[in-house]
Amino acid sequence: MHEIFSCRLPKPGRDADALAPSRRDFLIVVVGTGVVLGYARSTLAAIELPLAAAQQTAPGKFFEPTIWYSIDRNGAVTVNIKCAEMGQHVGTALARIVADELEGDWNKVRTIYADSNPKWGSMMTGGSYSVWQNFPVLSRAGAAGRIALIEEGAKLLGVPFEACTARNGAVIAGGRLIAYGDIVARGNLNRTYTPDQLKQMPIKPPSERRLIGRETLALDIPPKTNGEARYGIDAVVDGMIYARPKVPPTRYDCTVRSIDDSAAKSVPGYIQSLALDDPSGTASGWVMVYADSFVAASRAADLVRVEWSVPGAAQVSEQDLQRHAAQLIADKNGGALVVDDPGMEAAFAAAKLTIERTYTTSTVMHFALEPVNALAFEKNGMFEVHTGNQWQTLALPWLAKALGRSEDKIVMVTYLLGGGFGRRLDGDYAVPAALAAKAVGKPVKMVCTRSDDMRFDCPRSPSMQVLRMAFGEGGKVTALEHHAAAGWPTLAMAPSFMPKGVNGVPFDPYAIHGADCWYTVGAQRLRALCNDLANRSFRPGWLRSVGSGWVNWGLESFMDEAAHAAGVDPVAFRLRLLDGAGRNAGGPPSAIGGAHRQAAVLSRVAQKVGWSGDTPKDVGLGVATTFGQERDMPTWVACVARVRVDRASGRVTVEKLTLVVDAGTIVCPDSARAQNEGAALWGLSMALHEGSEFVNGQPKDTNLDTYTPLRM
């Protein structure tokens, strides 16, 4: 269980500029040791990448027990990372898992971020899956290498296998040792393992771990602060030109009627403007403006005039979307029943008290620091796309359809991401870049301005939730009914990922996560509804914590109102429901303890803030508790917000957030803390400040002058 108390906010009324550190002041306090990042693709030697692969591994003999890492004759361990690095330090965490089981010398560990080679399997980074899902695979891969090295090291030392142990990059037998690098250089490492053998590979007990759970400097921090790191927007190749798009008025079904570039011809460096022909339908109605520099492309794009044929979606407003959501919820026969316990109607019919509430959220944009971009070109029969991306496996079929070639003739090279947040799960921006390069037969680097990015964003859909609760004798909760309507990103982009509800209707789990809670509430009904008007009007996207971000907000707000209606303290009310009865007891492999673990974090945070004590005048405490995106994720969290209200102006100021988190095994504590703090502050930002709306089929806010997230 980890406690986080660092989310204290500045008091209102102070000059924001006086509080804001300069970029130089911020960077100058960050220090660390060096690290090498790179891509193992010798065909791209002319491209500016993080660092050349040749700098990473000593020439000559090396040992590669699995596809996930190799060891060279100097003992350097190079770990292949198939997940995207976007500030969460995933490479450090995954390398740490390998190195701990391998007993590698952490000072000799390096990471390579892999391209879209099919050997890596599905490549997706999001949903808090990376460490959770890769831990078993990578830990067993590390253990397999350790056993093979001990076997060969024992032979070289002339001692039995049983007399040897491994520690910190060496095999030790009594007072003698041989380094891993020497074993690689001198030995005959030919041990192989079948997939079934790897699955059965024993790993260390937690008490013997030396790296997992210990503080360490993230491997990507030094290159990010000294300028060596390379993001997608930094990618270059000889002979490339630049392009900026003219984004059509709606996501779908726009067609170009005419292009007038007469004014753009006055811009030095301007080349031409072309309408893209996209068989995939990803970039319908896009016009690409080419120039010899991004500055020229951007200036020219502002002068190019495009006339489109616009579909009916151009008239859709936020109010239309919410009205449609209300109509969907009112129709009791629609949607997918995710949970549908018997006894629901009887519980409400016999209830001593019932309550019903409706909760809505507005459109939320991503606004990643690095606007979307991609460099694309054809070389030696392969079409290469260089960009920061979270889900290469999803984007490759779109690229194949758009380019008219098979997926094995396309490779995506993933760079560091200047913000992911779910935006780069949707690799739609790779398609127009590739089409732009195909159209002119040369490398093209497409860079969107922030406004372009937002017009083409896949925002978090506006949502509506209706919750009902029934109370029986003694205030016992006897039923909970929960309806949630929103645009469904998985339906728009990956419908094969959608399971079926108990009524046989497919649903988007990422638009309902968090509703199937750990509370014991008697009969439970959970209904997920797709706001089809939203899906027709724009492409809904996944955004930081996905469905849980807005679904749990509705559920926990409702729990407060239910506690008030029942006349029970909000913490006590929740603890009463977190009794671990039935399926809420949880179970293996990851959710052992279930509701009791959620009750533990809730009790702990209440204790830390003095929940039952007095607060100053005009200051109150608010509480919420939730769990990981999936019920079987080993994560439970509770948060208390200390809030001050100015009675004269009505201004609400959140003074402090206190979080307690149980996330099971923590590989990198500092990174886990940072992710929790960032999630809490972003949630606060969306609650108090963020939110846009659709006006005439477009998001109203396309830059940070009107879209106002939480400020430093």
Report residues per predicted region.
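N-terminal secretory signal peptides
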Residues: 1-21
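N-terminal export signals
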Residues: 2, 19, 25-47
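Flexible, low-hydrophobicity surface segments
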Residues: 2-5, 49-55, 99-101, 106-334, ...
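Glycine-rich loop/linker segments at domain edges
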Residues: 2-8, 120, 129-134, 185-234, ...
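Conserved beta-alpha junction segments in alpha/beta enzyme cores
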Residues: 49-97, 222-223, 229, 234-235, ...
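Short beta-strand elements
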Residues: 66-72, 223, 229, 373-378, ...
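Thiamine diphosphate
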Residues: 91, 96, 397, 416-441, ...
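C-terminal catalytic domains of large/alpha subunits in multi-subunit enzymes
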Residues: 99-121, 150-178, 265-267, 402-411, ...
